[in-house]
């Protein structure tokens, strides 16, 4: 299980948040910083918390192929996370073109409408577990 802490909410003091991450890790629950890069978190947040996962916000992906700065940010974050053993999910994958560009930076997970629209619990169970689940 992975709990996501959204970037748009104001964090506790980093030391308190590190304790929260440690508590959940001891219970076998992983934490992810969601929408990374658009709110309060910074490289210092990564250094202090060393979260098991970050999810790069879709806004950096939307203009990939047109805006070199956004692609450079994604490349930088993925390189940093690879070197520090932080897993990365890139949000906002909506086309084959975007998928091809992002894949060359080797994120652990990809998320977006290219793969599926959001599903209800019943639709998810039918699709991935089988009818009648």
Which residues fall in each region the model found?
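EAL-family c-di-GMP phosphodiesterase catalytic domain
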Residues: 1-14, 29-133
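Catalytic-core regions built around general acid/base machinery
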Residues: 19-27, 76
């Amino acid at each position: 299980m992975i709990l996501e802490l959204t970037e748009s909410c104001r964090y506790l003091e980093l030391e308190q948040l590190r304790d929260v991450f440690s508590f959940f890790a001891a219970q076998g629950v992983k934490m992810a910083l969601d929408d990374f890069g658009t709110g309060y978190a910074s490289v210092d947040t990564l250094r202090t918390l060393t979260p098991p996962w970050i999810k790069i916000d879709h806004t950096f992906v939307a203009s990939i192929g047109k805006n070199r700065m956004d692609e450079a940010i994604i490349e930088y974050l993925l390189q940093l996370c690879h070197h520090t053993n932080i897993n990365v999910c890139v949000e906002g994958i909506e086309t084959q073109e975007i998928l091809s560009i992002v894949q060359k930076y080797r994120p652990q997970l990809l998320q977006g409408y290219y793969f599926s629209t959001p599903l209800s619990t019943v639709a998810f169970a039918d699709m991935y577990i089988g009818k009648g689940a």
